[in-house]
């Protein structure tokens, strides 16, 4: 309970950091449809189509989400029991990631939360367990489209083939094996023996020879590298928002540890706003009433 409360508080801090940035810089507009009522796998296929992704393996998922207007923040160590959660807040989609397991797991967690954002924006009294299954199914199809799995892998693939393709899709070997079996491309017996063999090779709790690092944000390094507003640091933002600097750094996915954005690509922070709006009299999101909408998913 304490760690869940810490995750909610960290989410509130993340929203404050995002608001501070949005008041001073122009960020990508939200391009995330509501696909409630659709099946999870159809929604994943539809979102890929709307975003022009085809069925190919996805690039850096954090940067893809940022480009489509999703605000992606990190969670601090005190929220260790929460892998990720998401919420819509004042018209903006937010995802909060712990990133304490493997980078492949973090990608799946982010895809899972995008599934919640498009499928469960207006939640009713439905089954939370069913929503979790739907978000998992969305993430699987979004990261590993059936069309591509069939193209890349033969029926009943070998472990070496699984490992080769899982690197191409930047997913865990176990997740890919499960997907292949779920698609009817692997017999029950081979599925069990493959999972056993992968477990013996360390793939149950980790990802040997996997991604070398977590995917990085493009937005936060660009904010920190900007000189038009003077030197921008996590400490400065923390002082202006009156929140702990550790919360700011976690919210910014530890971007201060990296001097430059992660590789070439389109600049997401287009320009500095001419003036930041007056915050006087605005009740901060950290207040109890404003934070009620934040719930770990």
What kind of feature is each model-predicted range?
Residues 1-297:
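Short juxta-domain linker segments that transition from a proline/glycine-rich
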